[in-house]
């Protein structure tokens, strides 16, 4: 699409492929990236010739390692990163989105693939939630959708302990659908999307709506928590100390959380 700087768009028959194109930055999600993804997903929604999509990150090291930290600290509501808009778009479009995880899926990147309908992971993929380590947290999709996907205990383990999980472990816990050799995730995801595109679009759309229906009431809570509560949290001393410690590769000082 003309004018995009952070997202590459490719179509092959009924399949759309969206690639987050910031490999030098770990394919982090800044405001520009999210606005382009939101626009591309809206075009996908309204194009009758496109029946399935693939979402991936450029390069072979990173799928996405979350939000651009420098753009997440404003208390101005108008400046909140529109990441919930992207999650919501993927969740509510009556067409399937298949994630191709080709490397690290960390923080918001792990949430991003979780919100997708299916996930194909390369064998070198790594999955991790890091919020409590770096002074942040997920306020909606990354908690209850993750719980739906891997179970309550495992989801809390991922969030509370911030461990790294291999592609094999992710497959075992149900976080991904399939693991393929390194470098083959995108191609395999496109094959899966093309196969889905041969099915009834109305039936697939109805199924997706049914899967998402029981979460509709939670969406407003997710928005409130992300856009308001998380924004306020990022201004606390605790969030600042955790973020600074992570950047400096040192242990955080808990005394600075409230002093």
Please report, for each region that a protein language model flagged, where it lies by residue:
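Hydrophobic alpha-helical membrane-association signature
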Residues: 33-37, 82, 112, 185, ...
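A general structural signal for well-ordered alpha-helical segments in protein cores
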Residues: 69, 83, 143, 152-155, ...
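Crotonase-fold acyl-CoA enzyme core
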Residues: 89-201
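Terminal peptide-recognition signature
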Residues: 18, 22, 36-37, 55, ...
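Glycine-centered loop/turn positions within well-structured domains
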Residues: 24, 60-61, 144, 156
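Conserved CoA-thioester-binding segment of acyl-CoA-metabolizing enzymes
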Residues: 1-56
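Glycine- (often His-adjacent) and acidic-residue-rich active-site loop
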Residues: 35, 49, 57-89, 105, ...
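C-terminal alpha-helix plus adjacent terminal tail
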Residues: 1-13, 47-48, 60, 162-168, ...
